[in-house]
């Protein structure tokens, strides 16, 4: 869909997972891409919406610890990894999809690690679910006091769109959010232009190549 990303002022590379054995396998597969760098691991079915999101990403960048995760309060924490913290924000426990959660704080699918995560992922063994668990990566950092958690405010809306019901809820929310704020959410062309990764001329060229749609009409308003 996006090719090399050159047309957006970005650079993309691709690989694929031969077997679905869990999220930590991404570090194994992407070890050459990661190299000696720190990186973000984002799950494609997770959606974050809110003007303050950039502020929280800045907190991650300024963190002194090599591993950072986010937390959000949810009504059904048992559907995700649950994190428990004390009154000072120190991590007490992390459990993957517990039947009886001891907290309403869950860990959304956006993680930040240093290169050591590659070696951690190589040592992991499959859980009872038959998968490598991303929670075990968190716990490895945590036992070495190298993991921080950054709670997101209620102004940030998070959706796990892993099923059709949640996808519908998220889609309706995005529609109303865009109407209210007169903007586009998740428009890669608009982001590239606003970040000045591409010129106005290139932005217009990208828009002109799009098929006729409301999305195209809305993008034109930003030129």
Give the residues covered by each predicted segment:
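Catalytic-core segments of class I nucleotidyltransferases/pyrophosphorylases
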Residues: 40, 54, 58-62, 87-197, ...
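Short, amphipathic C-terminal "tail helix"
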Residues: 197-223
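Conserved beta-loop-beta/alpha segment of the NTase-like Rossmann-fold superfamily
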Residues: 2-87, 112-115, 119-124
